[in-house]
């Protein structure tokens, strides 16, 4: 089996692939993040001798068919996507970084473009996991997760499950739980403590 992670980040998906004996390809835009991922991945013993590769690229523009040919394969058996939650946290100055999308429409168009690029190389009947949270801005809840879900459902995917993952702290609120609670009470807004894992089957 081969898995594809289009937003590799710190390398967790490849670490888990090594533990499970699955070959893996990770895509990451930022060079400095790739080095962090490599350091993390190298700490994990490769007892199953899995193959894995990290590619520095804009995941929405990559020629996936060409990249897979390098490994002698034409399909992957699982795809995971954990994109930036639009502009909640700005990860870089790169204009290709999804956290720099100027509007919700631009962000969703980029997600749709990525789904279109990866759908042909996901084996039929296999699964796509999409991890995303919502956004709260100017007194309004923006259901980012469900907007992305709808973009994916426009393609050849059937929604199989929605897993809600609870968490108490995020990067943006690290060690500031009481401060953010106070801000929420005074400002009249909601503190997010969850994100979604949407599980889709390619049909």
Give the ranges of each region predicted by the language model:
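Class I S-adenosyl-L-methionine-dependent methyltransferase catalytic core
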Residues: 1-203
